[in-house]
Design a protein with these regions (language model features):
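A conserved pocket-lining segment of Rossmann-fold NAD(P)-dependent short-chain dehydrogenase/reductase
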Residues: 16-36, 40, 44-61
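Mid/C-terminal beta-alpha module of Rossmann-like enzyme folds, strongest
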Residues: 48-112, 125-166
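Short, hinge-like loop/turn segments at secondary-structure boundaries
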Residues: 13-18, 104-106
Length: 166
């Protein structure tokens, strides 16, 4: 599933977008994700290299399932926008058009048609062993995200200063 952490390009992007836009047009708004903390993934890699998970498939997922819309709202709320900005779920054909346009923007695509297609399948745990099989209790996004997205965090303060400069 999606990996989140202090320098991620996922929740931080959604938090920044909400500082600039009055609403968020969102393709794939109802897609499901089970975000996992980068530190839990790193620990799983270490434990696997030490032999605990060697030659096994481990599903690296956090304990909570969200829709993309809920993740966008959580990012906004955690960054100091109560409830986050309104999210406008886009119909599939508009989402495809949005992704096509984003593929051609400078700086790497925020979303591609391939990303959108992959979101049609839920990015959540199945019956395979998870992080707990390595003795790892996955951290909840709802507990970790506010520690790095909050309005008093360095990255957020820089964004606030840039917004005031405009």
């Amino acid at each position: 599933s999606v990996i989140f952490g202090a320098d991620d390009k996922f929740l931080n992007l959604f938090a920044r977008m909400q500082k600039l836009a009055p609403f968020i047009p969102l393709a794939g708004a109802h897609s499901q994700f089970q975000p996992v903390w980068v530190e839990d993934v790193a620990l799983a890699v270490v434990k696997s290299l030490e032999g605990q998970g060697f030659r096994r498939v481990i599903e690296a997922c956090g304990p909570e399932v969200y829709t993309l819309k809920q993740l966008v709202q959580l990012a906004g709320n955690a960054s100091g926008i109560p409830g986050g900005r309104p999210v406008l779920p886009l119909p599939d054909w508009v989402g495809q058009l949005q992704a096509l346009v984003m593929e051609h923007l400078p700086g790497g695509p925020l979303m591609s048609r391939d990303n959108l297609a992959s979101m049609r399948v839920a990015n959540v745990a199945t019956s395979l062993p998870g992080l707990s099989s390595l003795g790892i209790q996955p951290a909840a996004l709802s507990a970790i995200a506010p520690t790095y997205l909050g309005p008093d965090k360095p990255m957020q303060r820089n964004d606030d200063l840039r917004a005031r400069k405009r």
